[in-house]
C-alpha cells in the first residue's frame, strides 16, 4: 500500500494492552471505572474550589487548572480505547491519530509547567508570606497560566507539523493503546531525524528545566522551614506543600518509569502497562491526594457534597 501521499485515507491499528479476547471485558471495565473516577474526582475538586470563596487564592486557582488538564488528558486517550474494545475495531484514522498525538503531548506539557508554577507559588507563600498576595496577584497568575498554555500549544504544533511530512508505506500496527509519537515515528519510512531531535530537545527543556525549578523552589522552602521557630508555622508550611510534593513525585516518578521501561525492555506490552500509570492512574489519583492531604480542600468537598445531598 502506497500511503505516503494518501494520509487522509490512512488508518493505523492500535493493538492495545492485550490481544487476548478473554481479557477485553476486564480491561474495558477497569479503564471505564478509572476514567469515571478521574473525571468525577477532578470535577469535584474544580466545583469545590469554585464554590468556596476561601479557596479563591492563587494556589487553588492553579489546582483547578491542573484538575481540568487531568480530565482532558484522560479524555483524549481512554474513550477511544473503550470504543475500540467495545466495537472490536482497533482502527484509528490518520487524522484521529494525529489529534491524539497532539493532545497526548499537549496536556503532559501543561501538567509539567503547572506543577512548576505551583512550586513557585508555594515558594513565595512560605519564603515571602508578607508579600505573597502582592507578588501572586491575579494578573501574574493569569499570565503564568496563559504562558503554560501557549508553550504547550506551540510545542505540540511544532511536533505535529513535522509529523505531517512523514511518509508511511509499510506496517501500520501500533503496539500500544493510543497513538504516541515515538511509536508513530517507528512506522515511518521517511527520515525521522528532525522529529527525534525535537523530542530529545523538548524533553530536556520541558522536562528537566521545570524539574530543576521545582527542586530549587523546595530547597528554598526547606531552608525557610528549618529557620522557623514556631512548630505551628512549620506544620502549616509542611501541610501546604505536602500534597503538591506528592503529586510532583507521582507525576515525575511514573514519567521516569515509562522512559526507564522503554530503555531496558523491548516488550511493547510492558511499556504499555508502564504508560497506564503515567496516562491513566496519575490523573485519577491526583484529586485523592489533594482531598486527603489538604484540610481546606477536604472541608470544601464536604460542604459541596452536603449542599448537593440537601438538594436531593
UniProtKB/Swiss-Prot annotation:
InterPro entries: GPCR_Rhodpsn, GPCR_Rhodpsn_7TM, Olfact_rcpt. The chain crosses the membrane at residues 26-46, 55-75, 100-120, 140-160, 198-217, 238-258, 272-292. Disulfide bonds join 97-189. GO terms for biological process: regulation of DNA-templated transcription; signal transduction. This is Olfactory receptor 7D2. It is found in: Cell membrane. The keyword DNA damage does not apply. Gene3D superfamilies: Rhodopsin 7-helix transmembrane proteins (1.20.1070.10). Glycans are attached at residue 5. Residues 1-25, 76-99, 161-197, 259-271 are extracellular. Residues 47-54, 121-139, 218-237, 293-312 are cytoplasmic. It comes from the Eukaryota. PROSITE patterns: G_PROTEIN_RECEP_F1_1, G_PROTEIN_RECEP_F1_2. Odorant receptor. The keyword Glycoprotein applies. Belongs to the G-protein coupled receptor 1 family. Keywords: Cell membrane, Disulfide bond, G-protein coupled receptor, Glycoprotein, Membrane, Olfaction, Receptor, Sensory transduction, Transducer, Transmembrane, Transmembrane helix. It is a multi-pass membrane protein. GO terms for cellular component: plasma membrane. One of its GO terms (molecular function) is olfactory receptor activity.
Amino acid at each position: 500500500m502506497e500511503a505516503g501521499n494518501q494520509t487522509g485515507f490512512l488508518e493505523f491499528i492500535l493493538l492495545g494492552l492485550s490481544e487476548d479476547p478473554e481479557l477485553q471485558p476486564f480491561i474495558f471495565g477497569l479503564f471505564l471505572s478509572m476514567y469515571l473516577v478521574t473525571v468525577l474526582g477532578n470535577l469535584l475538586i474544580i466545583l469545590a474550589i469554585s464554590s468556596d470563596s476561601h479557596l479563591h487564592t492563587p494556589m487553588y486557582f492553579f489546582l483547578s487548572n491542573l484538575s481540568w488538564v487531568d480530565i482532558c488528558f484522560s479524555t483524549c486517550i481512554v474513550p477511544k480505547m473503550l470504543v475500540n474494545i467495545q466495537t472490536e475495531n482497533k482502527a484509528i484514522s490518520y487524522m484521529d491519530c494525529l489529534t491524539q498525538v497532539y493532545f497526548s503531548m499537549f496536556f503532559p506539557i501543561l501538567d509539567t509547567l503547572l506543577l512548576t508554577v505551583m512550586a513557585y507559588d508555594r515558594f513565595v507563600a512560605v519564603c515571602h508570606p508578607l508579600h505573597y498576595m502582592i507578588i501572586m496577584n491575579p494578573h501574574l497568575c493569569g499570565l503564568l497560566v496563559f504562558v503554560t498554555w501557549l508553550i504547550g500549544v506551540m510545542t505540540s504544533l511544532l511536533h505535529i507539523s513535522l509529523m505531517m511530512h512523514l511518509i508511511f508505506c509499510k506496517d501500520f500496527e501500533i503496539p500500544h493503546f493510543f497513538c504516541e509519537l515515538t511509536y508513530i515515528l517507528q512506522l515511518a519510512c521517511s527520515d525521522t531525524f528532525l522529529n527525534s531531535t525535537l523530542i530529545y530537545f523538548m524533553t530536556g527543556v520541558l522536562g528537566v528545566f521545570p524539574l530543576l525549578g521545582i527542586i530549587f523552589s523546595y530547597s528554598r522552602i526547606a531552608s525557610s522551614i528549618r529557620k522557623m521557630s514556631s512548630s505551628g508555622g512549620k506544620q502549616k508550611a509542611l501541610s501546604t506543600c505536602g500534597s503538591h510534593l506528592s503529586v510532583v513525585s507521582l507525576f515525575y516518578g511514573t514519567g521516569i518509569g515509562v522512559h526507564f521501561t522503554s530503555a531496558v525492555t523491548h516488550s511493547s506490552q510492558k511499556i504499555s502497562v508502564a504508560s497506564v500509570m503515567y496516562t491513566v492512574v496519575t490523573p485519577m489519583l491526583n484529586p485523592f491526594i489533594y482531598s486527603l492531604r489538604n484540610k481546606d480542600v477536604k472541608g470544601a468537598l464536604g460542604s459541596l457534597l452536603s449542599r448537593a445531598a440537601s438538594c436531593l
